[in-house]
Regions:
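Solvent-exposed loop/turn segments connecting transmembrane beta-strands
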Residues: 80-82, 105-114, 159-161, 222-224, ...
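N-terminal periplasmic/intermembrane-space "pro-region" immediately following the signal or transit peptide
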Residues: 21-64, 416
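Outer membrane beta-barrel
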Residues: 51-72, 79-188, 193, 234-237, ...
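Outer-membrane beta-barrel "beta-signal"
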Residues: 323, 402-416
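Transmembrane beta-barrel strands of outer-membrane/channel proteins
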Residues: 61-69, 103-105, 131-133, 179-183, ...
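Signature for the C-terminal beta-barrel architecture of outer-membrane proteins
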Residues: 44-56, 121-129, 158-299, 303-321, ...
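Flexible, surface-exposed loop regions and adjacent strand-edge segments
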Residues: 76-80, 146-151, 194-202, 262-264, ...
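Sequence/structural signature of outer-membrane beta-barrel proteins
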Residues: 66-74, 106-110, 138-140, 145, ...
């Protein structure tokens, strides 16, 4: 992967991050298979400076389908569910001495985008630097959620988020420290992508033609720039168990392309990730606020965000409460080697009291069989944007509705 030199304007940010945040573990992408991306510690650099390093390249990908049943969708009920294409992706990961790199591109029905792409340098065993489009250090990583559908915080850009910038990570002993600076969200014009077609949710420009049906009364021209992130985590180990406590924070600007004005956005997260034998427990609290420039009055109560080629409105201030409990059961049933039973809960507390809060409970099983991974999820949700009637999609994370919805989904993924 070719990477351009850093602009001069990044140098102060880099020096600040290096001194203030000697940095933490990078996340990954949502694949239940053993992580494909080469870790910096897997460097193939030779012991002798006289020996040329070798290029170690891994190529891979995945093909996934969904089997979906939605009780709230009349057509889906009449057809007794649908078997649909989810995604096809290609990955390239590797190392060259102390250098490492990773790239992933995804294809969906009708759109495509760059999921991630970065290059990095391993300064020492517990310190590395990476630049490009990579996971934002915020909350439990690589994922808080166990289910294929994620928790509600993901849909507001606070879980498994990817942006374009520079990250430093430092992992001394049981500590994990991260500092990062992102010039902007990932650019989506690469290889035919569109503004709305991206993997993770970001504040984006949109028009009333896009979201007039969902209450957008005027065109929006906002986007994310100049975001700083910091994360500190500590893992406490005792008697074969481990508990990781982490605190994350981010702050940046929202830029209005029409007025050229900017305003601030920020978020904080406090999390616990515990591994107790075969059980895993995760708890998290997120507080956030986004102040959209160029808007006044009630229009400031929501921002426009998008991913997967679909925009919607999100409450500009609120909290997310999340929890997850999982149990890993190794088995020997033909090709099946493991079941992971889980229950994920999340709650979206929106700042305008008149708006209906969001809630989600997802109970499921992840079945592992060699390269085949199957998520089986049963969802009971309110104002989950991807589990409700299409007419409510654009306002689910804003005004919302009182309706509860039930769905059942199986995601079948072949990873290679």
């Amino acid at each position: 992967m070719r990477t351009s030199l850093l602009p001069v304007s990044w140098i102060p940010a880099f020096l600040f991050l290096t001194m203030a945040f000697p940095a933490a573990a990078d996340g990954g992408e949502r694949s239940p298979d053993p992580v494909i991306a080469a870790a910096p510690g897997d460097s193939v650099a030779a012991d002798s400076a006289d020996v040329e390093p070798e290029l170690d390249l891994d190529l891979g990908g995945a093909l996934r389908f969904n089997v979906l049943f939605e009780e709230f969708d009349r057509t889906n009920r009449q057809k007794t569910g649908e078997f649909t294409f989810d995604t096809f992706r290609v990955n390239a990961d590797g190392t060259y001495g102390d250098l490492f790199f990773s790239a992933e591109y995804r294809f969906y029905a009708g759109y495509r985008f760059l999921h991630s792409g970065y290059a990095g340098y391993e300064v020492q065993d517990d310190l590395d630097v990476r630049v490009g489009v990579h996971q934002v250090p915020f909350g439990v990583q690589p994922y808080f959620s166990n289910s294929w559908f994620f928790n509600l915080a993901y849909y507001a850009g606070f879980e498994d988020d990817y942006d374009a910038g520079l990250k430093v990570r430092y992992t001394p002993g049981n500590w994990t420290l991260i500092g990062a600076y992102y010039m902007n969200a990932e650019q989506t014009g690469f290889a035919g992508g569109t503004t709305f077609a991206r993997y993770s949710f970001d504040v984006v420009p949109a028009t009333t033609d896009d979201l007039g049906y969902a209450g957008l009364e005027a065109d929006r021209f906002n986007q994310e720039i100049n975001q700083f992130n910091g994360k500190v985590a500590y893992t406490l180990e005792a008697g074969g168990t481990s508990t990781t406590f982490s605190v994350s924070g981010q702050t940046g600007q929202l830029y209005n392309r029409s007025t050229t004005g900017t305003e601030r956005h920020w978020a904080t997260s406090v999390d616990l990730d515990g591994q107790y034998g075969r059980f895993n427990l995760r708890l998290g609290l997120i507080r956030y606020e986004m102040r959209p420039p160029g808007t006044t009055g009630p229009g400031r109560d929501a921002v426009v965000m998008a991913a997967y080629n679909a925009p919607y409105r999100v409450a500009s201030k609120g909290r997310f409460y999340s929890g997850g409990l999982a149990y890993n059961l190794p088995v020997d049933l033909g090709p099946i080697s493991r079941f992971r039973f889980y229950n994920d809960v999340s709650y979206h507390d929106k700042a305008p009291d008149a708006w209906v809060d969001g809630a989600s409970n997802i109970t499921g099983i992840l079945t592992s069989a060699g390269p085949l991974f199957i998520y089986t999820d049963f969802l009971v949700t309110r104002n989950h944007p991807f589990s409700l009637p299409a007419s409510d999609f654009g306002s689910a994370l804003a005004e919302g509705s009182e309706e509860w919805n039930v769905a059942f989904n199986m995601n079948l993924g072949l990873y290679f």
